[in-house]
Amino acid sequence: MAKLITKNKQVFRDYEIIDKLEAGIVLQGWEVKSIRASDVNLKGSYCVFKANELYLINSYIGLYMAVKGDERQSRKLLLHKNQLRRLKQKVESQSLSIVPLSLYWNKKSKVKAEIALVRGLKKHDKREKLKKEETNKKLKKLISY
């Protein structure tokens, strides 16, 4: 796989992941330099449709040196038209959300975003998930002895 830049750990706790996709992301030069310096955070970010295009909202990319820009500006995600259509249809019909899971460098040194179609978990679902994880850990410990 490619080199991981950042991961949105909050998504794995708060959502049920239904489908994953790889998307390109439109960046300016200073944003790429900030990403190389690991000054990026996906916590609290999400994706929305604007005029049949998908945008990444509320992702933080720090300012590089003395550049004047917006750290939390919306960034366009690049997907094929059929992928966009399918995603939009699922979001509207099944009331799902789209969130970024991670940013990484691909083999051609391009920044890619891994996005996911997700459904929010309720509080009791999160508790059940934690209980299952704890019991699995205990079972693994018992098996290893």
From Swiss-Prot:
Sequence similarity: Belongs to the SmpB family.
Subcellular location: Cytoplasm
NCBIfam families membership: PRK05422.1 (NF003843), smpB (TIGR00086)
Cellular-component GO terms for this entry: cytosol
Entries under Pfam families matching the protein: SmpB
GO MF entries: RNA binding
Its job: Required for rescue of stalled ribosomes mediated by trans-translation. Binds to transfer-messenger RNA (tmRNA), required for stable association of tmRNA with ribosomes. tmRNA and SmpB together mimic tRNA shape, replacing the anticodon stem-loop with SmpB. tmRNA is encoded by the ssrA gene; the 2 termini fold to resemble tRNA(Ala) and it encodes a 'tag peptide', a short internal open reading frame. During trans-translation Ala-aminoacylated tmRNA acts like a tRNA, entering the A-site of stalled ribosomes, displacing the stalled mRNA.
PROSITE patterns listed in its UniProt record: SSRP (PS01317)
InterPro entries listed in its UniProt record: SmpB, SsrA-bd_prot, SsrA-bd_prot_CS
Broad class of where this protein is predominantly found: cytoplasm
Record keywords, A-Z: Cytoplasm, RNA-binding
Gene Ontology biological-process annotations: trans-translation
Name of the protein in its database record: SsrA-binding protein
Record keyword RNA-binding present: yes
